[in-house]
Structure formats: structure tokens, C-alpha cells
């Protein structure tokens, strides 16, 4: 199942790139096909609309280096419950190292690739307080993460957090990171 997902992704991203950069695309793949698919009026941004690639495996990181304007980590593929809080930064650091290697192997400037972490993908609890967020964001910023996506608090869900803390983070937290 995982191999098939990777195979599909490996076929999909190059096709998506063609669909967004060519006036007409014809492609016959194992999973996806397009016959004279037209892109009208085409992308306003050139060469195409940017996309970010969320992947942590070797093939996905290679695709991120080749096609993405950004890379997204959703943490350890095993899930946040399986990675102790004190080990979570090391997991992301290792992923960033593999991404850097994929960029180097593909002739891509690693620094030009935006790097994003989805909060909630690691076991840390950065939305417990302003200080917790600043520590969390500072840790990942130091590792090379450019952006952190945090979830709006949703009561009675995995995203149940204090709205007042969330608003304080938005108002004051980012300024503390520099």
C-alpha cells in the first residue's frame, strides 16, 4: 500500500507540473492520464502556481526538491504519539538533512525551498502558553523550519486549545522570534 502511494505520487507530481506549465498536456501513465488537457487561461504566476510537497520518504523528498516551492513536514510518519517529546526535534532535523541531500543530489538550492512544519504532527504542546509556543517555534526555527502552521482552536477535538492563548501567540509570539 505504501509503495503504491509513493508510485502514485511519483507519477502525479510531474504530471501536475506539466499540466500547470504547458498549454496542452497528453500523458499516459499507470495511474493518471491526460489527453490534450488544456490549461486555459493558464497560470498567472510563471512558470506556474507554486505548490508545496508534503513528504518524508526518500522518493517524496526527491520530488519536493525537484518540483516544490516548499516542503511540508507532518512529523514522524509513525505519528506524534510514537515519538517522545524530547525526540521530536531530532526527527525533524533528520528529515531536513535528507531534504538537503535530495536538493544537493538534484542540483536544487536548499535555501530556496521553503520549509514548513504542521503543528500537531509532533507531541509537543506549543499552544499551552505563549512561552511554550516561543520555545517550540524557536527550536524549529533554529533547525531550519521557515514556517509553522498552527491550528485554530476547535473545542472537543484534537485541536482543542485556549483561544485566548492562540490570540496572544498571534499578537505577541511572532515578534519574539525575530
Annotate each PLM feature.
Residues 1-178:
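Active-site-adjacent structural elements that line small-molecule/cofactor binding pockets in enzymes
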Amino acid at each position: 500500500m505504501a509503495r503504491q502511494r509513493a508510485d502514485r505520487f511519483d507519477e502525479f507530481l510531474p504530471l501536475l507540473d506539466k499540466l500547470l506549465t504547458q498549454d496542452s498536456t497528453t500523458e499516459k501513465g499507470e495511474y493518471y492520464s491526460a489527453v490534450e488537457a488544456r490549461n486555459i487561461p493558464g497560470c498567472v504566476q510563471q512558470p506556474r502556481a507554486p505548490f508545496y510537497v508534503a513528504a518524508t520518504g526518500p522518493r517524496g523528498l526527491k520530488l519536493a526538491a525537484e518540483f516544490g516551492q516548499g516542503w511540508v513536514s507532518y512529523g514522524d510518519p509513525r505519528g506524534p504519539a510514537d515519538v517522545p517529546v524530547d525526540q521530536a526535534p531530532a526527527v525533524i532535523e533528520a528529515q531536513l538533512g535528507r531534504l538537503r541531500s535530495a536538493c544537493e543530489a538534484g542540483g536544487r538550492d536548499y535555501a530556496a525551498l521553503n520549509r514548513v512544519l504542521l503543528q500537531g504532527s509532533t507531541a509537543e504542546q506549543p499552544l499551552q502558553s505563549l512561552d511554550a509556543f516561543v520555545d517550540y517555534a524557536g527550536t524549529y526555527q533554529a533547525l531550519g523550519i521557515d514556517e509553522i502552521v498552527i491550528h485554530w482552536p476547535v473545542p472537543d477535538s484534537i485541536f482543542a486549545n485556549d483561544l485566548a492563548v492562540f490570540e496572544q501567540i498571534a499578537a505577541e509570539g511572532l515578534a519574539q522570534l525575530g
